[in-house]
Amino acid sequence: TSMSHNEAGNYKDGDGNRVHSSFERRNQMLQLGFTPTENTLLTGTYERSRGEAAYADRMMDGSKFDRDAWNVRFVQRNITPWFTELELRYGQSKIDHVMDTYSMRYLSMMGNQVKKAMNPKRETNTGHLKATFDWPDINLQTGIDYMRDKHLSRMEMNGEGYRHKPYQPQQNFTQWGGFVEGAWTASDSRKFISGYRYDEVKAEYDTLI
């Protein structure tokens, strides 16, 4: 397990003027592992992050930076004399951000008098499966990858609030990939390696209303 906390207040420039630049970030991570047999491994990880940041160079501040992520991993070794390893991984992360003009500054700053906010949200799912085979002088690895990346958002333009509004889709990405790599040890001084990978990506875009 691990934890970290970082923060800083606004600093002053060479003329003693306060610069809008404070930030805070809190992170926690927990990882557990289990080995039911000498050839089997199970692990699980959870990560949590919370933060906020003030920006002197733009019209909005990051009043909410939330991220939650988890993943699991399974490894089985020495399944047969030639099927040496099977690995499976799956994970998910969720990001919830808020950028606004009023939570961390006065509305009069930078000449902005209107309450505005953007609330983007993102969810990513990933998967990975790999098998390893070994014969005398030959090693073969093959597997598949998967990723699903979903983006949503909602906004506030005239102080009407955003929390009651539904999220609108912005863009989605789906990726499937397959790979194979083989290695042949011809002699103590010669080794030949060859591989192939194929990926298919689908992208969908929507306009935020």
Language model features with spans:
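Periplasmic-side early beta-strands and strand-to-turn transitions of outer-membrane beta-barrels
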Residues: 1-65
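Face-selective signature of the C-terminal outer-membrane beta-barrel domain
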Residues: 35, 39-49, 67-209
